[in-house]
C-alpha cells in the first residue's frame, strides 16, 4: 500500500465521519430537534470540478496500469464527494437552547437582531458575526418566524 492510498483512506474516513455526524449525530446533540429546515446548496460547480479532477486521476491510473486499490479509493472518494454535494441537503436544526447552522451550534441568546432581505435571505446578527441563511423554500421562512414567536422567552 502506497502513501497515496493511505492519504486517500484518511480523506475517505474523514468525509465519512463528517457525513455520519451531519446526518445522524447532529440531530441527537443538544436535545430534541424542534424544527428542521433545508437550506439552498452552495457551490455545486466546485464539487463538479473536484469530481472531474478525480475522474482524470482515475483515467490516468487505469491507463498507466496503476494499483487497482488506488482506482477503487479514488472512485470511493468521488462518490462521497458527490453525495455530500448533490444528495445531502444542508440544514438548519432548531433545538431548545439554540440552533445548528453550518455544523456549528449557536445559542439563541447570542442573537442580537434578525432581518429578512428583499430576496428572501434571513440575516441573523450575532455578537461578532452575521449569518446569511438562504432557505430552499420561501415558506420555510414563515415556519422559522412562527417558531421564534412561539418560543420567545
Swiss-Prot record:
Residue ranges crossing the lipid bilayer per the database entry: 6-26, 45-65, 67-87
GO cellular component entries: plasma membrane
Keyword set includes Oxidoreductase: no
Record keywords: Cell inner membrane, Cell membrane, Membrane, Transmembrane, Transmembrane helix
Keyword Membrane included in the entry's annotation: yes
InterPro entries, per the entry: DUF986 (IPR009328)
Subcellular location: Cell inner membrane
UniProt topology in membrane: Multi-pass membrane protein
Primary location group: membrane
Source superkingdom: Bacteria
Stated family: Belongs to the UPF0266 family.
Protein name in the entry: UPF0266 membrane protein YE1773
Organism: Yersinia enterocolitica serotype O:8 / biotype 1B (strain NCTC 13174 / 8081)
